Amino acid sequence: MSSIGIGLYGTGIAADNHAYAIAKSSKFSLVSVADEKYNLAQSFSKRHHIDRCHGDLEYLLEDSSVDIVLLASPFPFNSKHFPFIAETGRSVIIETPLAPSLKEAENSRVPKYGWVKHCPCSALRSNIW
């Protein structure tokens, strides 16, 4: 059975923690990383031995090896990035709040895409990774 490909958007401190957790998994592999600051994506990909890095979310979403997108951008931007990811039909993992307010979350078009579950990352790591 091949592993499920994770594409990571955002390269901050939380992203490092996710990368270390994913590296320990036999079920998942970190196949692609992107950050709007391309130099950060490059250094992150070298540090975590990821073959593909991008300077834009759009390029990450064009990567056919990405099955799930782990959105690790600062939370005020999650509601902006989420619809673009969801429109590809991929599952999205977001550890932080979707938006700074309920109104922004509702306006992010989440209801259009279906199921949403609050799943703290620590529970995700212990149950899946």
Mark where each language-model region is.
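N-terminal Rossmann-like dinucleotide-binding module
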Residues: 1-48
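Structural signature of beta-strand start/N-cap positions in the alpha/beta core
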Residues: 5, 29-30, 65-68, 91, ...
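Structural motif
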Residues: 9, 72, 95, 121-123
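Short alpha-helical
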Residues: 13, 39-40, 76-77, 100, ...
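Short helix-capping segments at alpha-helix termini
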Residues: 26-27, 88, 113-116
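Beta-loop-alpha module in the N-terminal Rossmann-like domain of NAD(P)-dependent dehydrogenases
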Residues: 48-110
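A contiguous active-site-proximal alpha/beta segment in oxidoreductase catalytic domains
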Residues: 99-129
